[in-house]
């Protein structure tokens, strides 16, 4: 029904003169119907009435400010691309409804937010191409999918990187269903349980982060002198800088050396995460089985890890290893059970609240509980389908490097878990600024928190800076930080 789709487009872009955050300012039309669709859309545009917004017979009012009117005009003048169709508008702070067709997906007008009554359009041939073009943007607030084939619409909707997707509709809101975006459209939700939980606080008093200084010493190595490498893309890799640091035990004995990761190593880890995006598409059951297998492999080497913890910290590590195994089992159990909801909304239809992985998460692991803290943060994140870059405990990094072989033998795809060792202060800022890292969690030195949040503001990255009581099972509390909620509005019936 092309006519209904045309009405939907008119409502999406020219509601409030296109000056709304969820305006449907980019139009993707199937190539076979593009000419017919554009003709009908232009005819509908010609009938739009422009004038005093207090007149109930008026469709389009004035632009919010003359500066915004000038900005829209300047943007169009700076990029005279495609074919422009424009209706007339009265004098004053008005801008005529505008349609620009024939644009390339990389055109600045397709990539930048115009925030006005301007609709830019391009065509696609297949649904796969449509999804690629739709997701080729910095923003991700809302999208509309129009199709008579509901199966096709339900195939496309979950693939769109947006916080809310309307099927055969637009601009539908309700307090029962969350509204919010991803990428540079921001984070957080209004409405729904996910919107409410954003304003809640834990009942228990928050834990305090402990910053622990590394042990020093001048003793020689007791056995073979080893330098642990980084773990990137399922392989051990030498640091780009070539630098390493000695790690000493509490009595000054040299336990080994660890690599010092740099910005370049972080970039390599991000590339490995990008190559492992298929992990998000795997079933919760498969992710659970891999986590169970990881727990079994760690259990088989429990004595070895407990001994390593004692040599690093001076304390018995048996309880920490047992708790780490328990956290893996807990995350595995949640992998296929932390599911979404079906909301009753005021249309003849439903809104599906789907839990989706955040993407790539950078995690600064706590100094204390070097094994338990790492696994407690890592396991829920990968259980939800995320890829992670872990900056190991700064004073006790060797326990993380011992984990490489457990990961290698647990059927975990390369790139899902990447482990860096080195100074958290060297890795925190690049993590927060990197455009391909979707969230940063910091359980390390609290002095790093402010810098992380300031650096992440440039790309609206989700941040979580705080402390947890690692002796408790925090898996359920971590899961909301590891997921985004996408609401898909689906009509049914006549």
Protein language model features and the residues they cover:
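Short acidic active-site motifs
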Residues: 129, 349, 426-427
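Extended, hydrophobic interaction surfaces within ordered domains
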Residues: 39, 70-73, 151-152, 156-215, ...
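Glycine-rich loop-to-alpha-helix module at the N-terminal edge of alpha/beta enzyme cores
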Residues: 151, 252-338
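Short acidic-hydrophobic, aromatic-tinged amphipathic segments that line or gate anion-handling sites
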Residues: 121-125, 418-423
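Short, well-ordered beta-strand elements within core beta-sheets of diverse protein domains
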Residues: 26-31, 60-71, 98-101, 114-126, ...
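Hydrophobic face of amphipathic alpha-helices that form TPR/SEL1-like repeat modules
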Residues: 199-255, 337
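ALDH superfamily catalytic-core signature
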Residues: 1-104, 133, 167, 211-213, ...
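Conserved small-residue-rich beta-alpha loop and adjacent elements
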Residues: 243, 250, 333, 337-413
């Amino acid at each position: 029904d092309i006519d209904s789709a045309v009405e939907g487009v008119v409502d999406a872009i020219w509601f409030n003169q296109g000056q709304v955050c969820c305006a449907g300012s980019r139009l993707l039309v199937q190539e076979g119907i593009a000419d017919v669709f554009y003709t009908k859309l232009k005819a509908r545009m010609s009938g739009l009435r422009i004038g005093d917004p207090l007149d109930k017979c008026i469709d389009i009012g004035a632009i919010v400010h003359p500066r915004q009117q000038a900005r829209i005009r300047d943007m169009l003048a700076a990029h005279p691309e495609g074919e422009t169709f424009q209706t007339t508008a009265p004098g004053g702070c008005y801008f005529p409804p505008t349609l620009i067709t024939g644009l390339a997906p990389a055109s600045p007008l397709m990539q930048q937010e115009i925030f006005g009554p301007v609709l830019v359009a391009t065509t696609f041939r297949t649904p796969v191409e449509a999804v690629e073009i739709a997701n080729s943007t910095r923003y991700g607030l809302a999208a509309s999918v129009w199709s008579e084939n509901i199966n096709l619409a339900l195939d496309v909707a979950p693939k769109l990187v947006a916080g809310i997707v309307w099927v055969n509709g637009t601009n539908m809101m309700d307090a029962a269903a969350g509204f919010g975006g991803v990428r540079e459209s921001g984070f957080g939700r209004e409405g729904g349980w996910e919107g409410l939980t954003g304003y809640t606080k834990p009942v228990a008093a928050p834990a305090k982060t402990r910053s622990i200084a590394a042990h020093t010493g001048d003793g020689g190595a007791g056995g073979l002198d080893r330098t642990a490498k980084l773990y990137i893309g399922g392989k051990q890799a030498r640091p780009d800088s070539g630098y390493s640091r000695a790690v000493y035990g509490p009595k000054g004995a040299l336990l080994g050396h660890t690599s010092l990761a740099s910005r370049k190593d972080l970039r390599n880890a991000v590339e490995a995460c990008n190559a492992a995006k298929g992990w998000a598409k795997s079933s919760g059951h498969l992710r659970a089985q891999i986590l169970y297998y990881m727990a079994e492999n760690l259990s088989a080497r429990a004595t070895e890890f407990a001994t390593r913890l004692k040599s690093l910290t001076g304390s018995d590590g048996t309880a920490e290893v047992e708790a780490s195994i328990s956290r893996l089992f807990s995350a595995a159990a949640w992998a296929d059970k932390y599911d979404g909801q079906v909301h009753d909304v005021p249309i003849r239809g439903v809104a599906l609240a789907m839990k989706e992985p955040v993407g790539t998460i950078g995690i600064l692991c706590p100094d204390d509980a070097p094994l338990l803290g790492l696994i407690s943060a890592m396991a829920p994140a990968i259980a939800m389908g995320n890829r992670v870059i872990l900056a190991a405990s700064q004073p006790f990094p060797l326990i993380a490097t011992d984990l490489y072989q457990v990961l290698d033998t647990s059927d975990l795809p390369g790139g899902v878990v990447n482990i860096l060792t080195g100074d958290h202060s060297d890795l925190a800022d690049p993590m927060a600024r990197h455009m391909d890292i979707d969230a940063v969690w910091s359980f390390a030195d609290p002095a790093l928190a402010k810098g992380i949040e300031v650096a992440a503001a440039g790309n609206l990255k989700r941040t979580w800076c705080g402390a947890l009581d690692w002796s408790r099972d925090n898996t359920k509390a971590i899961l909301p930080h590891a997921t985004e909620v996408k609401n898909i509005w689906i009509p049914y019936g006549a």
